[in-house]
Amino acid sequence: MPKQPNLNQMMRQVQQMQDEMAKAQEALKTEEVEASAGGGMVTVKITGALEIKEIRIDPDAVDPEDVDMLQDMVLAAVNEAIRSAQELAEKRLGGAMGGLQNLGLPGLGL
């Protein structure tokens, strides 16, 4: 019969993991990533918590005859910034979640 994990030890590990997750989530509020589109004509800065902090548009990108192009560049830059921020969050929060593997709980696939 496999050795059962110590309940007190498991609770301490869960509490430690919760603390690490809270710290990582707080840090994501201040960490920023940047993405651009149109060769840098549109740039978006976003936090790891998915709050857009800045959108910069090069004046050369503004063509009243081609508003659709500008809209497409803004959309592409925002979507790329979101993807980058999500990758950052996965990296930061994944480290905090690593503690689950050490709990030895059967059935969690960890």
Model-found features: residue ranges?
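Residue-level signature of catalytic and energy-coupling elements of molecular machines
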Residues: 14, 50, 74
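N-terminal intrinsically disordered, cationic/polar leader segments
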Residues: 30, 36-53
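A short, well-structured alpha-helical segment
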Residues: 68-72
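Stable alpha-helical structural segments in soluble proteins, enriched in small hydrophobic residues
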Residues: 73, 77-88
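A broad detector of the eukaryotic-type serine/threonine protein kinase catalytic domain
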Residues: 6, 57, 78-79
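Long amphipathic alpha-helical segments used for membrane anchoring, targeting, substrate engagement
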Residues: 1-30, 34, 84-110
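A short interface-forming secondary-structure element
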Residues: 39, 55-67
